[in-house]
């Protein structure tokens, strides 16, 4: 139940894309470099230690910027029930963590090309990724891209006159 929740598709996209990339390892194999990944979910099932599901998280356990979520339960049935009653809770949590991480990074390092052009032309301040170096700037329209062969990202900002609430 948890694996399928974490691998669920991002809603609203024209094609299916998973919300998160998941790597599953047995507890005995969770060593070395695996401990330094950004987001970790540790599931512990122990009927002698737990009577109900508990969820918590810690920051920076093995690496800076890391979030480790602990999901503890007495049995697999209680985890399935938790997944049903808290649908998308784990996905939403990890997505929010990643969004906050991206915001923090964009506050430190961003494209001055995008910032300067949008500020001067459209009076908009926008922190786009620093690798957005390609751009086209015309009256009321701005396009920028990282122009990458893989992982390409584009940004379009434009204005048009407001005429009524249906504009």
Question: Which residues make up each language-model segment?
Answer:
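N-terminal targeting sequences that direct proteins away from the cytosol to non-cytosolic compartments
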Residues: 1-167
């Amino acid at each position: 139940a948890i694996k399928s929740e974490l691998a669920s598709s991002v809603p609203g996209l024209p094609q299916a894309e998973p919300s998160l990339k998941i790597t599953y390892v047995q507890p005995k194999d969770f060593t070395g470099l695996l401990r330094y990944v950004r987001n970790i979910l540790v599931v512990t099932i122990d009927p002698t230690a737990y009577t109900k599901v508990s969820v918590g998280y810690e920051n920076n356990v093995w690496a800076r910027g890391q979030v480790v979520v602990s999901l503890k339960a007495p049995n697999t049935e209680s985890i399935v029930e938790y997944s049903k009653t808290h649908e998308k809770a784990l996905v939403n949590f990890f997505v929010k963590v990643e969004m906050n991480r991206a915001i923090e990074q964009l506050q430190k390092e961003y494209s001055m090309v995008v910032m300067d052009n949008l500020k001067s032309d459209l009076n908009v301040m926008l922190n786009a990724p620093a690798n957005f170096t390609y751009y086209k700037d015309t009256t009321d329209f701005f396009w920028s891209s990282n122009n990458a062969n893989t992982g390409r990202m584009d940004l379009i900002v434009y204005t048009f006159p407001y005429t009524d609430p249906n504009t």
